[in-house]
A protein has these predicted regions:
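C-terminal motif of bacterial Sec signal peptides marking the signal peptidase cleavage site
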Residues: 10-13
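Extracytoplasmic/secreted proteins, especially bacterial periplasmic and envelope-associated proteins
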Residues: 38-45, 61, 65-72, 142-149, ...
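A non-catalytic alpha/beta surface segment that caps or lines the substrate-entry region
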Residues: 44-104
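Second-shell loop/turn segments in exported
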Residues: 25-33, 48-57, 84-87, 129-141, ...
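Acidic/histidine-rich catalytic neighborhood of metal-dependent amide-processing enzymes
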Residues: 131-235, 260, 264
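N-terminal capping segment at the start of a domain
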Residues: 16-62, 73, 287-304
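Solvent-exposed loop/turn segments at secondary-structure junctions
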Residues: 52-54, 83-86, 103-105, 115-119, ...
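Active-site-adjacent substrate-binding region
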Residues: 81, 91, 209, 216-325
């Protein structure tokens, strides 16, 4: 992902998106308890394969594991394979993984995350690490881990009134590295999401709304309201931040403006019309990066994954899903 705009507005409370009393009163605590220990284990298992960089054995083996886990939890799984071109002309063997809970239901919610790893730790404070791959415990594995735990809970509860499509986007993090002389206009990122949004797994695919989970396991993370999410899907931002408040995680979901992030939700919004938001960590006071101290560094490992963060995000999404009628 790429942060394309950072401004004073990020730190100013967004008065227009404050929830009304009616919105808050309309939502009560709902859904099963999200198991952060289970999500943490899913995150660790992905990392055990090694960095899931494009065209690598670790990538392919992890993909097989993700497919098997969603199938284990009763989802119907499709794999959308495509040869995509990286910024440098490299052919990327991409595999978007789509797991559908209750595919027979016409009313659907889209949950998504990317599952590939950044091939270069180009934001590492040590320049000798810039061409090393990133383990991507947070920036990759955490979002998939939360989705897998939700899939496990849905199979167990089996009481959700809507269908859910879990989409694991590939080739998100092959964007132009900072050490390259190439001009970065954002098009080199989110390649799998770009492809899926133009070639959905089901012709004419529709969903009530979508939620992208990106970097949702980092220690000290907070989730501000991302700019493009507010632009394309303000009602969904309101819904999710209300759910966070009801679930007891208002402190991690402040009612403040974040940056404008080029991420997987961007092509989904532009090409499908499905109002989709990005739950993405924002660290306004971090000198290393507003995405946090481990972003695109060799330190993005399980040592820096916080179960409390996974719990807050996972329980918030559960609250959203089980509040849908």
């Amino acid at each position: 992902m790429l942060c394309v705009a950072l401004a004073v507005a990020m730190l100013v409370s967004c008065k227009s998106s404050k929830k009304t009393d009616a919105e808050q009163n309309a939502m009560s605590v709902a859904g099963p308890a999200f198991d952060a220990d289970s999500a943490y284990a899913f995150c660790a298992r992905q990392c055990e394969f090694g960095p899931r960089t494009m065209n690598s054995e670790a990538h392919d083996r992890c993909g097989e594991w993700i497919v098997a886990k969603f199938q284990q939890y009763g989802c119907t799984v499709q794999q959308q394979r495509a040869d995509l071109k990286g910024y440098d002309g490299t052919t990327l063997k991409s595999n978007n993984i789509i797991a559908s809970y209750k595919p027979e239901l016409t009313t659907r919610i889209l949950l998504c995350a990317h599952w590939d790893s950044r091939p270069w730790a180009d934001n590492d404070p040590d320049s000798t690490n810039w061409r090393k791959p990133v383990m991507a415990a947070n920036d990759g594995a955490s979002g998939v881990a939360v989705m897998l735990e939700i899939a496990r809970l849905l199979q167990k509860a089996d009481s959700l009134k809507v269908g859910v499509d879990f989409v694991c986007f590939d080739a998100e993090d092959w964007g132009i590295p900072q050490w390259s002389d190439a001009t970065d206009n954002g098009d080199s990122w989110a390649l799998g999401a770009q492809y899926w949004s133009q070639n959905p797994h089901k012709p004419g695919y529709e969903a009530r709304f979508g939620i992208l989970l990106d970097m949702v396991g980092g220690a000290g993370a907070r989730f501000y309201q991302e700019g493009f999410s507010k632009e394309y899907a303000q009602p969904i931002v309101n819904k999710v931040w209300t759910a966070a408040r009801v679930a007891g995680y208002e402190s991690l979901f402040p009612n403040d403006q974040g940056g404008y992030i080029t991420d997987d939700h961007d092509p989904v919004n532009k090409n499908t019309g499905i109002p989709t938001i990005d739950i993405i960590a924002f660290y306004p006071n971090c000198q290393q990066s507003s995405f946090g101290p481990t972003w695109h560094t060799v330190s993005d490992t399980m040592d820096n994954i916080d179960k409390a963060t996974l719990k807050a995000v996972g329980q918030t999404v559960i609250q959203v899903l089980f509040s849908e009628k």
